[in-house]
């Protein structure tokens, strides 16, 4: 059943989206429109405003991107939270924070706990402890008895050196506030530390020396490495109660070994074991969850046991893909706001949809994969602008060309220039890049 905000039998609800990342905000208008919401967007992303204008002027795009009542554009990113405090939040039935940066800014804002609770996807101050903090999350999960990898907190350089010296098993070293896999490093006891290995992964000593050169901000999280599949169990909660969820396995990632997923294998909820739903309900209470949660865990190869290691208190770009298996978040969210219904398990099989399906995210594929319809990508681009996809492909190719040009300059031009002339060229390049980033037509970043 598809629910729409213009259904005469239902009153529309109102939602406010707040965030810096246009990529993460993009999926919400369509999802919330189907759930019966009229949407306002408060953002510093100029591209969202540009796309919103194009949606309003194009009936096909408007239908595909849902109903956005207004976009409130903030010129300076640092003013986003301040702007949200000047809005009448009582007019909204749902407030959605779109990205980790906005979550951290709200947490750091000099406002009352009550105001933070009005904005953040938690229902009690207990939830503040883990927002934007990998260490805080590990401690909360441990205290609640939720299965999570063993961990220790590294508070200074001395403790970091001691960790490496006494290493007896592979450890994941994580910067406390980081995302996208960029702050995650493997310390593997199987490496010699000399870099001479069949794998590209450097040894523990090399990793530590590299990190010390980056002016690390302590504390760090040292976490047991679990071998197995990465599962996504992203869910929507209200007052700690599970409203809807999805179940998928990472099949491919981008940027780095621990980066965001580009291809996933989704399964109908009817195929999911009851212990997974029990885990999700326990997580809702442990996290004080009151909104979208991006939940990730490891399924250990040897035992099949699940270990939760990530719970970002915002949705991911995959938030609306469960609909391709009949597990539509929009239907469940509308049902909750109309009747208070939560997710009941076990979930009945939906014969109108496949039990499993492989789904890619178009903006994390290469242009060649998109052009050749790898993983049937065009089937899952119903809500995407073809012009936008073409622009992404052009930006991807241009970035690759620039990378080769930079390498050529470093190898073949720099040796022939005086240091002062080389620095002048670099300064000119930075000035051009900064100017381009300030223009309204800022490039889309992967």
Regions found by a protein language model. Give the residues of each.
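Conserved hydrophobic helix-helix packing surfaces used for dimerization/oligomerization
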Residues: 13-16, 171
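Conserved N-proximal alpha/beta basic substrate-recognition cap immediately N-terminal to
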Residues: 51-155
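ATP-grasp fold ATP-binding core
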Residues: 141, 164-186, 214-228, 245-249
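Glycine-rich phosphate/pyrophosphate-binding beta-alpha loops
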Residues: 181, 254-255, 312-326
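Phosphate-binding site of ATP-dependent enzymes
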Residues: 194-257, 267, 271-278, 298-299, ...
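Conserved metal-phosphate-binding beta-hairpin within the catalytic cores
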Residues: 284-320
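Peripheral (often C-terminal) accessory segments that flank ATP-dependent C-N-forming ligase machineries
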Residues: 331-446
């Amino acid at each position: 059943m598809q629910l729409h905000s213009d259904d005469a039998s239902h009153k529309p609800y109102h939602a406010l989206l707040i965030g810096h990342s246009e990529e993460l905000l993009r999926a919400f208008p369509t999802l919330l429109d189907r759930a019966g919401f009229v949407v306002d967007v408060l953002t510093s992303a100029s591209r969202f405003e540009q796309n919103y204008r194009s949606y309003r002027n194009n009936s096909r795009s408007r239908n595909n991107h849902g109903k956005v009542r207004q976009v409130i554009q903030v010129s300076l990113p640092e003013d986003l939270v301040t702007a949200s405090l000047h809005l009448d939040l009582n007019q909204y039935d749902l407030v959605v924070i779109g990205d980790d940066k906005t979550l951290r800014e709200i947490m750091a804002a000099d406002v009352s706990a009550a105001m933070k609770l009005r904005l953040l996807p938690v229902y009690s101050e207990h939830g503040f402890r883990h927002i934007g903090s990998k260490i805080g999350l590990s401690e909360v999960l441990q205290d609640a008895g939720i299965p999570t990898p063993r961990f220790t907190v590294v508070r200074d350089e001395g403790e970091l050196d001691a960790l490496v010296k006494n290493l007896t098993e592979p450890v994941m070293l994580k910067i406390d506030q980081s995302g996208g896999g960029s702050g995650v490093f493997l310390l593997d006891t199987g490496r010699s530390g000399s870099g001479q290995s069949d794998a590209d992964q450097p040894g523990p000593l090399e990793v530590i020396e590299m990190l010390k050169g980056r002016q690390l901000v302590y504390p760090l999280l040292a976490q047991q490495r679990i071998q197995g599949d990465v599962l996504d169990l992203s869910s929507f909660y209200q007052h700690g109660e599970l409203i809807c969820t999805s179940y998928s396995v990472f099949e491919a990632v981008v940027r780095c070994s621990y980066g965001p997923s580009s291809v996933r294998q989704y399964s109908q909820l009817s195929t999911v074991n009851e212990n997974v739903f029990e885990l999700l309900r326990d997580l809702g209470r442990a996290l004080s969850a009151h909104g979208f949660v991006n939940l990730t865990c490891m399924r250990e190869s040897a035992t099949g046991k699940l270990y939760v290691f990530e719970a970002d208190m915002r949705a991911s770009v995959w938030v609306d893909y469960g609909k391709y298996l009949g597990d539509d978040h929009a239907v469940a969210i509308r049902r909750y706001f109309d009747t208070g219904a939560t997710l009941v398990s076990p979930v009945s099989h939906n014969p109108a949809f496949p039990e499993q399906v492989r789904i890619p995210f178009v903006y994390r594929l290469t242009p060649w994969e998109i052009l050749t319809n790898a993983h049937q990508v065009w089937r899952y681009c119903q809500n995407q602008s073809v012009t936008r996809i073409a622009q992404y492909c052009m930006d991807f190719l241009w970035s690759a060309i620039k990378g080769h040009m930079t390498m050529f300059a470093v190898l073949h031009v720099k040796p022939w220039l005086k240091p002062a002339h080389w620095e002048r060229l670099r300064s000119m390049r930075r000035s051009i890049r900064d100017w381009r980033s300030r223009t309204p037509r800022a490039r889309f970043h992967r």
